[in-house]
Curated annotation (Swiss-Prot):
HAMAP family xrefs: Fe_traffic_YggX
Reported function: Could be a mediator in iron transactions between iron acquisition and iron-requiring processes, such as synthesis and/or repair of Fe-S clusters in biosynthetic enzymes.
Alphabetic keyword roster: Iron
Source lineage: Bacteria, Pseudomonadati, Pseudomonadota, Gammaproteobacteria, Enterobacterales
NADP is among the record's keywords: no
Gene3D superfamilies: Fe(II) trafficking protein YggX
Complex and partners: Monomer.
NCBIfam families the UniProt entry points to: PRK05408.1 (NF003817)
GO cellular component: cytosol
MF (Gene Ontology): iron ion binding
Protein name: Probable Fe(2+)-trafficking protein
Domain of life: Bacteria
PANTHER family per the UniProt record, alphabetical: FE(2+)-TRAFFICKING PROTEIN-RELATED
Organism: Klebsiella pneumoniae (strain 342)
Family, as annotated: Belongs to the Fe(2+)-trafficking protein family.
Amino acid sequence: MSRTIFCTFLQREADGQDFQLYPGELGKRIYNEISKEAWAQWQHKQTMLINEKKLSMMSPEHRKLLEQEMVQFLFEGKDVHIEGYTPPEKQ
C-alpha cells in the first residue's frame, strides 16, 4: 500500500517513497517531503548532470556537488543548469 504525502516540490498530495532512498537527516526529509514523481524528476536531472559534467561517484567533491544540486532542485525550487542543453519545448 502506498503512502500519501504533501510533496514540497510539487506542492500537492502525491505518492510518497516506499522507503528512505538517501542516508541521514537529508534522507529522512526526502522520505517525508518528496514524492515518487518528484524523485523521478530529480533522477533525470541527476543523470544529465553526471553525464554532462563527467562526474564520478567515487569523488567526494562530485558527490557533494550532486547533493547541493539535489537540495536546490527539490527544496529551493532552483532548476539544474546544464550548459549547452536546451529543453525540447524551447528549441
